[in-house]
Amino acid sequence: MKIENSNILVIGGAGFIGSFVVTELLKHPVNKVVVYDNLARGKVSYLSEQMKDERCSFYPFGGDIREIDILNTAMQGVDYVISLAAMWLLHCKDYPRTAFDVNIAGTFNILEACVNNNIKKLIW
């Protein structure tokens, strides 16, 4: 996968692991890295250093993978999508319906949005 001059959407990019993925992407000559995160578990503070790079930004209109229309818009002009979004495993037991909505339906939304936007590659 050649990421030079590409636009990359990192879903769940404000999470602990996602923030490290963003850091690694910015070490390469990418055009831009957009973080799509609902901040349910992620933290803006995880990306404080990365946001100093003009190529890095938060998607300004939301970050929930259950919102297919917003997700579709976020993927416009994107080359690659990296998805790290998921509901925390211990919460899945306590909130099974929400777990289904996020982990199953949300993942389907990501797949559908990737197809709709001709994404070159989804990494998840």
Regions found by a protein language model. Name each.
Residues 4, 109-124:
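Conserved Rossmann-fold NAD(P)-dependent oxidoreductase catalytic core, especially the SDR/UDP-sugar
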Residues 7, 31-32, 120-121:
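Residues at the starts of beta-strands that form the adenosine-phosphate
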Residues 8-28:
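N-terminal Rossmann NAD(P)H-binding glycine-rich loop of SDR-like oxidoreductase domains
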Residues 10-11, 83, 122-124:
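Structural signature of the Rossmann-like NAD(P)-dependent dehydrogenase/reductase core
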Residues 30-42:
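Conserved glycine-rich Rossmann-like NAD(P)H-binding loop of the short-chain dehydrogenase/reductase
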Residues 56-59:
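Short, conserved active-site loop motifs that form the nucleotide-linked donor/cofactor pocket
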Residues 62-102:
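NAD(P)H-binding glycine-rich loop region in Rossmannoid oxidoreductase-like domains
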Residues 67, 80, 106-109, 121:
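Conserved cofactor-binding/catalytic machinery of classical short-chain dehydrogenase/reductase
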